[in-house]
């Protein structure tokens, strides 16, 4: 078995599963390589629909009608990015009231914005939204430049050097779930078919 398997994923905590899944798979099939594409769930789904990506690791809420999927037992935590020397960093958590008077960067995905709107409640209509962004890395650069505070999934953020930009969890906590998905009825390569089987076995959804 050989070939390339393409995986699309966001900057979310569930990505930490991929090294273990891929490593154990490549012990059986060392001639299989992987391509990782980083984007939001909407763009990953679009690429999957076009047959350009085999598998997606998606942050919910997301419409899964056309896909087979496994919901992962990992809680994705929402946090606010800020400069490390910001007065807000002295707090253990950040509330909607705290953020209601600050310039903000929000996620680009509309269904995710709806989740955040529910969390903000009455404060949402009064927010000073500077811009929206699809990935947290560029948002962090804007935060470091003093432009705004950014609401992001903790995900990869915890791996960053926090000497310039740090984060604090929201209060009350806001969490989400993620799914591993592939398009239903898609004719996959042998390598991808075996990898999907391996994922199911690895996560205890199927027998080897």
What spans do the regions from the language model cover?
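Short secondary-structure boundary segments
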Residues: 60-61, 84, 111, 154-156, ...
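Central regulatory/effector-binding core of bacterial HTH transcription factors
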Residues: 2-64, 132-135
């Amino acid at each position: 078995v050989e070939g390339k398997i393409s995986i699309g994923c966001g900057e979310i905590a569930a990505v930490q599963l991929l090294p273990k899944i891929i490593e154990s798979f490549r012990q059986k099939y060392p001639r299989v390589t992987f391509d990782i594409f980083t984007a939001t769930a909407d763009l990953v789904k679009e690429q999957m629909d076009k047959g350009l990506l085999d598998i997606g690791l998606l942050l919910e809420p997301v419409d899964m009608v056309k896909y087979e999927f496994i919901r992962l037992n990992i809680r994705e935590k929402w946090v606010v990015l800020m400069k490390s020397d910001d007065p807000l960093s002295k707090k253990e958590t950040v509330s909607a009231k705290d953020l209601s008077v600050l310039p903000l960067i929000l996620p680009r995905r509309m269904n995710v914005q709806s989740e955040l709107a529910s969390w903000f409640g009455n404060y949402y209509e009064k927010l000073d939204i500077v811009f929206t962004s699809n990935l947290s890395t560029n948002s962090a650069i804007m935060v470091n430049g003093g432009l705004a505070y950014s609401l992001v999934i903790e995900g990869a953020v915890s791996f960053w050097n926090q000497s310039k930009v740090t984060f604090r969890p929201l209060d009350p906590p806001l969490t989400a779930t993620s799914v591993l998905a592939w398009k239903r009825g898609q004719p996959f390569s042998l390598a991808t078919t075996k990898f999907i089987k391996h994922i199911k076995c690895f996560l205890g959804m199927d027998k080897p």
